[in-house]
């Protein structure tokens, strides 16, 4: 049975199921491409920014700006570009940037959730409509005769839409769970990298505060005053 025959025998519900399958495949391909880039580049990008921040804070900002097409770089850039922030402000900037980037990384999840929920229901609807059509032609006097053979065939064809809906939902659910696992792993990476950057900044901030207290270096506020 070729795809065209399946569409014809599956009934009217096969057309919305076809649209959902196309939407599911396109979303899965886009997410696979996105996560492939994230997995390959995140650790390398984060290590380069952290290593640079340990040596030169200004250079680390430029490195993060050059790599800001990656979520991890956008996350680290948010607190890095603040002018002399208090450690608490630095921490809040990290948290806010993490929330923004992690939310963007879940793009497409709602589409897959809708497909997972709708596909079986549409398949079941197609089966019910097919059964109604098949059984409506049966008369009590036809029971046990050869005329009921077509009804049996019609019931079998009516189940095609249910099978199609389940297949779409199962495939979408499998990839949805994979993407969820990748997202949770990335959340742990964000937490680890953010903590390392915060430690580096607190160490830098306290060293500068000690220098200000000793009178060796003018404070940032004093540097900003007109001469």
From Swiss-Prot:
One of its GO terms (biological process) is protein import. It is found in: Cell inner membrane. The chain crosses the membrane at residues 10-30, 111-131, 155-175. The keyword Methyltransferase does not apply. Its main location: membrane. Signal peptide: none annotated. Keywords: Cell inner membrane, Cell membrane, Membrane, Protein transport, Transmembrane, Transmembrane helix, Transport. Coiled coil: none annotated. InterPro entries: ExbB/TolQ_transport (IPR050790), MotA_ExbB_proton_chnl (IPR002898). It is a multi-pass membrane protein. It comes from the Bacteria. GO terms for cellular component: plasma membrane. Pfam families: MotA_ExbB. Belongs to the ExbB/TolQ family. Involved in the TonB-dependent energy-dependent transport of various receptor-bound substrates. Protects ExbD from proteolytic degradation and functionally stabilizes TonB. This is Putative biopolymer transport protein ExbB-like 2.
């Amino acid at each position: 049975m070729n795809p065209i025959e399946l569409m014809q025998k599956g009934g009217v519900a096969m057309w919305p199921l076809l649209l959902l399958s196309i939407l599911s495949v396109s979303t899965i391909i886009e997410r696979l491409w996105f996560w492939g880039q994230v997995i390959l580049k995140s650790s390398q990008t984060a290590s380069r920014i952290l290593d640079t921040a340990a040596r030169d804070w200004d250079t680390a900002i430029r490195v993060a700006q050059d790599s800001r097409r990656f979520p991890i770089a956008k996350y680290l850039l948010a607190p890095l570009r603040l002018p002399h922030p208090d450690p608490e402000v630095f921490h809040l900037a990290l948290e806010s940037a993490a929330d923004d980037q992690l939310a963007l990384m879940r793009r497409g999840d709602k589409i897959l959730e809708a497909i997972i929920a709708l596909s079986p229901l549409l398949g079941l609807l197609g089966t019910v409509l097919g059964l109604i059509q098949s059984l409506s032609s049966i008369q009590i006097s036809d029971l046990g005769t050869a005329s009921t053979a077509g009804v049996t065939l019609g019931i079998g064809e009516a189940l095609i839409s249910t099978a199609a809906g389940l297949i779409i939902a199962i495939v979408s659910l499998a990839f949805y769970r994979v993407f969820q696992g990748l997202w949770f792993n990335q959340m742990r990476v964000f937490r680890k990298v953010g903590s390392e950057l915060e430690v580096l900044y607190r160490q830098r901030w306290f060293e500068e505060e000690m220098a200000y207290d000793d009178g060796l270096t003018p404070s940032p506020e004093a540097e900003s005053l007109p001469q």
